[in-house]
């Protein structure tokens, strides 16, 4: 852990008396290099911009760049997939979000397996909420290689404002 202080001798890191991360923890022991996006949209990140084979090759190259830049910190590749997308259309339930089909999430898991990557499932709740969206992803979040990402900027708590019209927020009550 002390090597993570990068020579800082102030004693602020690691925090005295704080528990160390559990064995197998990714952070702070590894650097996560993630490619972000949605398979349906070229404008939402690299996951949708490139064909899968090309995207994975580019991710592998980026991992190698980071390994070369800092050989002392292992690199963990990741696919950060937007599983619930805020949108301008209210949809059938008026929540202004679209849930990606499970087959798309399964495709991302397959790509991650090919590249030894972890997966972040990102949720943009819009007029919905975490308590409504999270249970639908539970089978995936139970997998050890799958993690959860919350997008606060699309959390429209007033129940009226469409996503993208203002910056949303989360607080402890949401979680």
Whereabouts are the PLM-identified features?
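Alpha/beta catalytic barrel-like cores
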Residues: 1-98
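Residue-identity detector for threonine
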Residues: 9, 72-73, 107, 161, ...
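Alpha-helix N-cap and loop-to-helix initiation/capping positions
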Residues: 50-54, 96-100, 129-132, 166-174
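Substrate-binding cleft of extracellular glycoside hydrolase catalytic domains
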Residues: 65-67, 74-153
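Substrate-binding surface in catalytic domains of secreted glycosidases
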Residues: 152-175
């Amino acid at each position: 852990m002390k090597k993570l202080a990068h020579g800082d001798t102030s004693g602020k890191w690691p925090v005295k008396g704080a528990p160390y991360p559990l064995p197998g923890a990714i952070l702070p022991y590894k650097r996560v290099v993630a490619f972000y996006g949605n398979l349906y949209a070229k404008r939402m990140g690299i996951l949708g911009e490139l064909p899968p084979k090309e995207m994975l090759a580019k991710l592998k190259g980026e991992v190698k760049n980071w390994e070369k830049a800092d050989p002392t910190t292992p690199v963990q590749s990741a696919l950060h997939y937007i599983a619930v997308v805020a949108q301008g259309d209210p949809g059938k339930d008026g929540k202004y979000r679209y849930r990606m089909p499970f087959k798309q999430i399964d495709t991302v898991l397959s790509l991650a397996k090919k590249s030894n990557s972890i997966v972040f499932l990102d949720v943009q709740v819009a007029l919905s909420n975490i308590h409504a969206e999270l249970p639908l992803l539970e089978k995936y979040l139970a997998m050890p290689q799958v993690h959860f990402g919350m997008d606060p900027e699309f959390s429209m708590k007033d129940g009226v404002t469409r996503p993208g019209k203002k910056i949303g927020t989360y607080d402890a009550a949401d979680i």
